[in-house]
Amino acid sequence: MSSWSKSFTRLVNGVSLVAKEIYNQSPELQRARNGDLEGLITSSGKKALVAATDLVGLTSGKLRELSIRRSKEPSVVYFDEGDNKDNVVATPEVRSVNTKPSEKIVDSKVLRNEFSDEVKNSNREGEIKVSGVEAGEIIGVRAVESGTVTEASSPSEVVPPVKRRRPRERKVPSTPMARAYGFFNLGAALAWGAVKESTYRMVNGTPMTPDNQPALSSLMSKENAERLALGLCEMRGAALKVGQMLSIQDESLVPAPILNALEYVRQGADVMPRSQLNPVLDAELGSNWQSKLTSFDYEPLAAASIGQVHRAVTKDGLEVAMKIQYPGVANSIESDIENVRRLLNYTNLIPKGLFLDRAIKVAKEELAQECDYEIEAVSQKRFRDLLSDTPGFYVPLVVDETSSKKILTTELISGIPIDKVALLDQKTRDYVGRKMLELTLKELFVFRFMQTDPNWGNFLYNEATKTINLIDFGAARDYPKKFVDDYLRMVMACAEKDSEGVIEMSRRLGFLTGDESDVMLDAHVQAGFIVGLPFAEPGGYAFRTNNIASSISNLGATMLKHRLSPPPDEAYSLHRKLSGAFLACIKLGATVPCRDLLLQVYNKYQFDDEPQDPVVATSSVSS
């Protein structure tokens, strides 16, 4: 059997498993199994028809073309005393997208029409916009990336075009049956795409990549990768969250063409329409929720995996950001992630050494917490207290009156995402890079409580006040004292190039079993030394001229091949945040006194037990 037919067979098997999930989760189909055909017809006929036209992709692998028009409904509504949401004064509408796709079925070339090429000129840095709102105005929300902005060497330098998704307003599949159908359609679309790609290759031969390497399997062609990304953007919820996690992986884990396609999922989800938004507001805040506000903007500032953010003004005049959760996502975490796992397994996208099952387990736990906005509100208040005396950081106020388990309202604050700071002068970039690393070390080794989502939009820099505004604490978590003790010792061993110390602490932490081959141990130690480089020498470490990411990438394949066990659960979130801090410094091209910052923490740290420490040193850092 040829390789393409084997791949196709694997995906067909995966689609059948998803179809089984539809059956297991659908109460209507359970009625049919019990012989209640009349109940099946009356309760689910119309629902199934509507759901089938509101989901990701088609079984033919083609997309419905969306027609964009200007909505007749206003974007911003104002509430007077005693008014309800149907009695409002409207401002001119900003933008809206037709909530219903046209029935025209278009060729797969239309896949390209879901995206646009934008050219960002670096001398127009004040014009970065997110959903029609200037990025500098956004505070308390996760900004949707407006394209990669690189450092400008001159005012006339033009950044290469960046491929971006065109925003769409579409209902969130919110019932178990609708979400299961969505995954079924997505899997079928991938299968059809694989058939077309395989047919093309049988006739024309396997295409080659720009570096003269054979292209990916027909199952994971560029077009199929884009289908996967678009499907996840429409499903939202845990499905999109997993896609976003994959999008920030290294090329040693996920092939570059797939990463390029998954970049679309980082640009934001499809937008939830007003018809779904109002019922959530009614259910969470009461049918008179508008009495608590002066105005509410239905045009979202941002749309993410679990919810979307809207600007509003409270009765006391405070501008706020209201994060509103998509309906159904909290109850579909388990099934969503299992369906994504099936698709990933049957597309062979994830290498064996990644220990997908363990990663999925951790993802389920993290997502369950992120879907509870009451937990996030507590975490945000805790961070606000912890950082209240730390210069250079600000955590916005939580507004309890308009917050609930599925709605989080916080003070709206201004700033630009950290990656856009790359457009500013070197002194500012060095300052921001230093503050980012200072925060990361303090979170882990002082607070033992860390916000683990490294999304650059979660850190908004206010140049006027030289303050980094911190938002989105859904992924905040505590770390056990013993784990932090040993992790600090391991970091110091890496900085001191102490091979025995790295191996010993890695075994104590659970990164190694003690039965690894010499090849694996050597790769693990060398990777640790590379990560420890910024902390190895006094003075400033120039992240611009030292590419840590590419150096580790060269060792990634070896470690994946020879790894015997998954890392400890704490490592998934921790390393996501640590790598994010390093990548931010690389993006900024910052020079940071990393060793001094580490020693400042290390020399004040109180270990619960005192084995031989890798180093005893003094700090030369200035306050």
Swiss-Prot record:
Residues 295-583 form the Protein kinase domain. One of its GO terms (molecular function) is transferase activity. GO terms for biological process: chlorophyll catabolic process; cytochrome complex assembly; response to UV-B; ubiquinone biosynthetic process. Keywords: ATP-binding, Membrane, Mitochondrion, Mitochondrion inner membrane, Nucleotide-binding, Transferase, Ubiquinone biosynthesis. Expressed in stems, leaves, buds and flowers. GO terms for cellular component: mitochondrial inner membrane; mitochondrion. The keyword ATP-binding applies. Pathway: Cofactor biosynthesis; ubiquinone biosynthesis. InterPro entries: ABC1_dom, ADCK3_dom, Atypical_kinase_ADCK, Kinase-like_dom_sf. The active site is at D453. It is a peripheral membrane protein. Its EC number is 2.7.-.-. It is an enzyme of class 2 (transferase). Signal peptide: none annotated. It holds the Pfam family ABC1. ATP binds at L301, A302, A303, A304, S305, I306, G307, Q308, V309, K323. Induction: Strongly induced by UV-B. It is found in: Mitochondrion inner membrane. Residues 152-173 are annotated as: Disordered. SUPFAM superfamilies: Protein kinase-like (PK-like) (SSF56112). Forms homopolymers. Predominantly associated with a complex of about 500 kDa. Atypical kinase involved in the biosynthesis of coenzyme Q, also named ubiquinone, an essential lipid-soluble electron transporter for aerobic cellular respiration. Belongs to the protein kinase superfamily. ADCK protein kinase family. This is Protein ABC transporter 1, mitochondrial. It comes from Arabidopsis thaliana (Mouse-ear cress).
